[in-house]
Amino acid sequence: MIALPQDRMDQLLKRFSMIESQMANNPDSDTYVKLASEYSELQDVVGKIRELSDARMEASDLAAMRDDASTDAEMRALAVEELPEVEKRIAVLEQDVQILLLPKDAADDKNAILEIRAGTGGLEATLFAGDLFRMYERYAAEKGWRVELVSASEGDAGGYKEIIATVSGKGVFSKLKFESGVHRVQRVPETEAGGRIHTSAATVAVLPEAEDIDIEIRNEDIRIDTMRASGAGGQHVNTTDSAVRITHIPTGIMVVQAEKSQHQNRARAMQILRARLYDMERQKAESERSQARRSQVGSGDRSERIRTYNFPQGRVTDHRINLTLYKLDRVMEGDLDELVDALISDHQTALLAELGEQP
């Protein structure tokens, strides 16, 4: 039996009942939207706590029936038969509640900025960067999310040297945050006459989209430069200084946007800068919080090789959790749920172990 914090569970039940009452009595109040949001957040955990409470009561009744000598023999036999099944259900519910009570990542409900950059491997790396972007596009479509292109630098033979997009929808960052790192591909390029397998890589960064309230950027901390946007081969695509480069002086972080609209470039560059600064703060806080024992998956180290896509063998391997799937074709079509769910589960297990080590 898992030792769950009963006081915390009772507080959540009490708070949920209070919200239900306030929403029913004041449907037109100014606080209704806020209450409805909190109600929605608590629904899952409160539902599981109530299920667990009912199951425990059922187990107690069955145990009492089994141990009561005055109970009809047939009823006692029935209790003996049913009790183990109820106890199994309790064990599952306790695990569910424990996970739902874990500290929430404040960024989990945010949208994300997805950045993919070709790494080692030349032309093959740019093609792979394009393959990864299409994989995430299809995954997003399956989830009902919206993907909007921010900027793209195309490769000479297709794919991308770099591509940045925003991904918007429910729970985007919670699902994509473990995709950050180096993705490696092993396959035979179409131009390889000898059939040799080449290895190349692309780097993925997933940043939670930050709002003004999340991160403060002071005007005196940024320098904004404008320049002419260049097209393929370096030719100027227009005669106005539409490209924008924003430098965050304290950190040295630089963001460049070079589309046709200077106003749009400035807004996009600030959006990406804000996300990178917010991500930097999150990484620093995570490092300080669990320096002694960092979650293997949660580190988000951009230089860490996290996954290998082996085309000749039709397999994909996530090195952080030693998971290998022989369905590479489906993964490249956006079927990422098995990988994503395994990573989330591993992270939750690490958090539970971390909490268990606390005095």
From Swiss-Prot:
Domain of life: Bacteria
Modification comment: Methylated by PrmC. Methylation increases the termination efficiency of RF1.
Modification N5-methylglutamine, positions: Q235
Main location: cytoplasm
Cross-referenced PROSITE patterns: RF_PROK_I (PS00745)
Keywords, in A-Z order: Cytoplasm, Methylation, Protein biosynthesis
UniProt name for this protein: Peptide chain release factor 1
Native organism: Brucella abortus (strain 2308)
Taxonomic lineage: Bacteria, Pseudomonadati, Pseudomonadota, Alphaproteobacteria, Hyphomicrobiales
Gene, per the UniProt record: prfA
